């Protein structure tokens, strides 16, 4: 019985050290390397058709913070956390038709603005 307690103690100590190391890194440290700023980049897939097609790509900011009590009272479904985010979107674009029937937006300027992931 004493053997199993020592074994369990070693496993718990190892797990504790691993979790401490894991939580000491900022979020996303393992998955992302410096995210580039929001700017125009060539879309390689559509540019193969002969005309260079540009697309806005890159990172903006996002943050989350506790919802103020005053705001929670007015919510239909109260939430403890409020989040904000901006996405890299086109400020200006030119409509382009490729191969007679493919209509695309060729971005000409980019900036960080409100995210509309649901927008088609």
Curated annotation (Swiss-Prot):
Disulfide bonds join 35-59, 38-88, 56-110, 60-112, 87-115. The keyword NAD does not apply. Residues 1-24 form the signal peptide. Glycans are attached at residues 80, 106. It is found in: Secreted. One of its GO terms (cellular component) is extracellular space. The keyword Disulfide bond applies. GO terms for biological process: G protein-coupled receptor signaling pathway; positive regulation of steroid biosynthetic process; regulation of signaling receptor activity; thyroid hormone generation. Gene3D superfamilies: Cystine-knot cytokines (2.10.90.10). It comes from the Eukaryota. Keywords: Disulfide bond, Glycoprotein, Hormone, Secreted, Signal. Pfam families: Hormone_6. One of its GO terms (molecular function) is follicle-stimulating hormone activity. Heterodimer. The active hormones thyrotropin, lutropin and follitropin are heterodimers composed of CGA, a common alpha chain described here and a unique beta chain which confers their biological specificity to the hormones: TSHB for thyrotropin, LHB for lutropin and FSHB for follitropin. Belongs to the glycoprotein hormones subunit alpha family. Shared alpha chain of the active heterodimeric glycoprotein hormones thyrotropin/thyroid stimulating hormone/TSH, lutropin/luteinizing hormone/LH and follitropin/follicle stimulating hormone/FSH. These hormones bind specific receptors on target cells that in turn activate downstream signaling pathways. This is Glycoprotein hormones alpha chain. It comes from Equus quagga burchellii (Burchell's zebra).
